Amino acid sequence: MASPPTEGYEGLTPFLRASLGDGDLPALARQWLDRAGREDTAAAWMNLATALLCLGQTPTAHAAQREALARARTYVLPGPGGSAPRLLLLAMPGPLSANTPLDCLLEGQGLQLLVHFVDPAAPVAEALPEHDALMLTMGVSEAALPVLAALQERLAAWPRPVINPPAAIVRTERASLSRLLADAPGVLMPPTRRVPRVLLEAAAVGAWPQGLEAPPFLLRPPDSQGGHGLTRIDTGEALGAYLAAQPEGEFFLTRYVDYAGPDGRFRKIRVALLGGRVFPVHLAVSEHWMVHYVNAGMYGDAVKRAQEAAFFRTFAEFAHRHAPAFSALSERLGLDYCCVDLAETADGRLLIFEADPAMVAHAMEPGAEFAYRREGIAPLREAFVRWVRGRLEERT
């Protein structure tokens, strides 16, 4: 029998909000450090771990997370409670990028969320709490692959709706995804493959192996997220310098595609796919080819924000223009819910960077200048709740 879910875990929401400027994140971390020491509860340790992960204090955060998981593995997130449907989120222990923080999208609305951190050593033996539907929130990683394989068998005949089945999540691994989308209509995703370090070291000293992509190309470590370890290689000298700084034994390699617009700026779009429909999440505009919303200058540039606001207003037109591509993405991925990072190429195709069920969708930036984002992401939030309720009605 499963232990009762632990109350008091706040999820990522308050810590992400503070990290975006609506609060004092270091003060929150100090508060939870004090409470963990005084109360010694699973929730206090997990809140401390989440705050420390947001601050980038990874080793200390993982130590706090282990303290929490030694006390409890299932936590209730803030929400409506009562008769609201109970959605059990299966999550991986580890970094924030390991799982989609659904609480940041829903912000306490519509569903009662319970998060269960699976035990990677025994993912099949664990007892799970009562729930109305189950959702796998983890993405693909070296740590998650054996867990997903074990869960595939366990959940095959699960008596409740299962959102994002394990086999579909596995298909989002970068090399697998590029093969999956190779001939998808309206889509461009250059082949991605794992390359052993030894081949790259040979190329760096001038012995370019036959079949190795010529520069420019992109390299990244297999488990990297958020651009960590990602670089563009233009010369053998640059390759040597990169390898000197990266200790990994293999890397993902993919051809670089210049997706700059006529003004020289790069625009990366994040959309969410939900039950075959597509929704806007954000548009980031940057002067650099490696675009992330938090470092693209969106917070201090009203012109960039105006472009994102226009993107939300005209998204229906964008989605209609790329309907065959989005239809192919939904069908081939086979995921109920995920986010996709992409750009629009000069020839009108969607350049796919990644598709990941663990990506975050939110509109938690404070201030009136981001009101358009809160309005723009509301349709996804409302549709997600309706979609889950619809899945439950299908079973009755």
What does each of the following model-derived ranges do?
Residues 1-77:
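Alpha-helical protein-protein interaction scaffolds
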Residues 74-202, 207:
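Conserved N-proximal alpha/beta basic substrate-recognition cap immediately N-terminal to
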Residues 139-142, 222-224, 358:
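Short glycine-rich anion-binding loops that position phosphate/pyrophosphate groups of nucleotides
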Residues 181-183, 190, 209-228, 248-263:
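ATP-grasp fold ATP-binding core
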Residues 217, 279-280, 338, 351-354:
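Protein kinase-like catalytic core scaffold
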Residues 231-325, 329:
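Phosphate-binding site of ATP-dependent enzymes
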Residues 331-335, 344-396:
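C-terminal active-site "lid" helix and adjoining low-complexity regulatory extension at the edge
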Residues 340-342:
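Hydrophobic residue at the +6 position relative to the catalytic HRD Asp in the kinase catalytic loop
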